[in-house]
């Protein structure tokens, strides 16, 4: 299995958010039935420390903005948000600005909007699972299987979590469409 262990990715995001000063987080999940996204949120709170605080924001950008703004208004002590997807992160950023809150924003996955938010400082980091590796590594495994007496790796091959932030966004963005 090649991929990103979502619970571990969330945990690493929570640990980093905690190290960056977050004390009261909120996880925005656009697909509450999607166990991978729930794992991201549960992992975030495992790393951050504290009880799970996850809301279903739907996949509709207007709903994401409205529900995020409502959550921030209802609990001004929220100082960290993890968005479980890139479009959620962009909508959360707008809600944070609309409410006038100061909130540490972290994301999952890459998009043009997330790239811009990392460059501007609106988002602290995103977790990149390197989708190209998820497609490339199985080819290598199949080649080895066919040329090495049917031998397979003994464990999962993680492609993430990897952090993208202001320190490496330009390098990562330059690889978009080539190696990422």
Label the predicted regions.
Residues 47-51, 133-180:
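Hinge/cleft segment of the Venus flytrap/periplasmic-binding protein
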Residues 9-13, 32-52, 67, 91, ...:
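Short, solvent-exposed amphipathic alpha-helices that sit
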Residues 23, 79, 124:
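Conserved acidic residues
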Residues 24-32:
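Short beta-strand segments enriched in small/hydrophobic residues
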Residues 116-124:
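CN hydrolase (nitrilase-like) catalytic-core segments centered on the catalytic cysteine
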Residues 44, 53, 57-117:
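Hydrophobic alpha-helical
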Residues 1-25, 62-65, 111-114, 129-149:
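Hydrophobic alpha-helical segments within soluble ligand-binding/sensing domains
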